[in-house]
Amino acid sequence: QGTVRTKAVGLRLGFSGDEFGYALDFGLPVPSSDPLRPTLFNLDPEFKRECLWRGPVLRPAALLADRAGPAVRVRDDSGAWAGSSRIGLTDSMLSELADPRACPELLVVRERLRSWRFYDQFRTDADAPARQDRIGTRTPVLDHDGGDLAAALRTIQEFGDDEALAEAVSDAFPRSRVEVEAVDGLLRLRFHQHGLLRPLAAAELSDGTLRYLLWVAALLSPRPPELLVLNEPETSLHPDLLPALAALIAKARAQLIVVSHARPLVHALSAIAPEAAVLELEKEFGATVLAGQGRLGRPAWHWPKR
């Protein structure tokens, strides 16, 4: 049931680990009261707070960098606050103040965040980037839209685990294989499927086949990230492909978070990798929460106050 808003509009994001923790608080700008300088950007969010600390829990003594509005302060080598800097309200201290000398911790966290990969929904329609021929360059990391699929697969074949790629394809499509050829400077994907007289081009693949090959390229990256997040990887896949997808996910060389609505995929993955944690989500007054987790079961966390 809806209620009257009692707090300021805002968006808070944060994470923590054994080494560092980071949190930010976005909010709306203070409306301009100057009639001579009106603005049309009153809904453009800005940073209200931004904090970086050592360890898993935010404590005043653990703070390494602290930002309130435009003012940012960082600790020096002795642990004392080294004055204050001012940055734009729409700029992050991670981008503006990360420096290997002044505050190396900001640089470490920034590069760690940059290495994380999130794959949400790959397009598989007729005009999808993954169906087009592209200029070939070494591609150790599949782009978020999958447009460099052919280059990513060829990079795995030449510089990565070619055997794992062949196995992932044959697990899903017995006696089939992928080939990448160069045509007038462009890389073109060819899919050799058992029973067909000629290979299929990317433009001819079914949505499910194309999407599976995209997951192969993402999960067998020669440059695995620290954190890889897949959102509903079962979309468009035939149910018979889910065991092969589960086996592919289980072999990933990264901390992996898979958001799925397909219980057969979850069950198949749990059977292959029993050490994987299964967390069920549910709605509670419009908010997404972990099922069965009470207040006492939540990890220790403190949001920085505005």
Spell out what each predicted region is.
Residues R154, E167-S170, P174-L220, L227, ...:
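Conserved ABC ATPase signature
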